Amino acid sequence: MSSALILVAGLITLPGVAAEKKTVTTNMKSNVQTDYMNGLLKLALSYSNKEYIYATTSEVYSRPRVMESVKSGSISVMWGGTSEEMERDFIPIRIDAYRGLMNHRLFFIRQGDQARFDRVKTFDDLKKIKFGQGRSWQDASILEGAGLQVVKATKKPSLYHMLDGGRFDAFPRGANEVWTELSAFPNLKLTVEKNLVLIYPLPTYFFVSPKDPELAKDIEFGLESAIKDGAFDRYFYNSPEVKEALGKADLKHRHAIRIANPYLPKATPLDRKELWLDLMGESPKSVSEPIAEAAQ
């Protein structure tokens, strides 16, 4: 072997040229959405020249605890609906992980209540319905801001039991969430409402610890790269969660009622059409839209 080849071989094995290893910690799995988001995170970071190692918390943290942990840096990244507050406290990756699918809310209702919802045609009709929501959820603020009645609970599982027990009338969930969640509560007399879809813009973003801006850059670079080369679309459409939602929700044949999201940050990239699905045959709507308009 020539001296030049020996030198090259030696350089290849030097520790200094090995890929940098970095641990990314997320909250322990709590639902099927965790699988989707973790998978998308790994797809994004596969475009980085760093070697990422993935870890989770030792137990499922509550939402407030997750937020505090991301602020402190003990959790690297979380995900959820955006707001001015979220984008102030964390580093937002402004690419909707679900391409607008989560903006479309279907209702859990009690079995036997469908006839009541068949009579809902306008926003004023919707104001007669009591909705269940998580106490710290952005959705609760959006519904209340629109003038809708909201009953809150601290823990999400409680909401299904409260609906079953008659504490409120409907529990709105993302179109990609309802089917899996329905199967998780087989002993409750609940079903998915058949004809309505409530729409408001609430993108699902990755939010990175302010202590780790390099991770935020890698996630954003990876998602943008995956959009450009088609990997994002392949991942999205091959997700069992998304396949089930698009197959069962029948969104184009539902009666749509839109409400505004007054908490949607101005930096939301509604003008980037490649980031959003056209699920209702329409373009994404901005927060300036009247809250009482129903799609005809």
At which residue positions do the language-model features occur?
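Short loop->beta-strand "edge-of-pocket" segments that line small-molecule binding or catalytic clefts
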Residues: 20-34, 119-136, 169-170
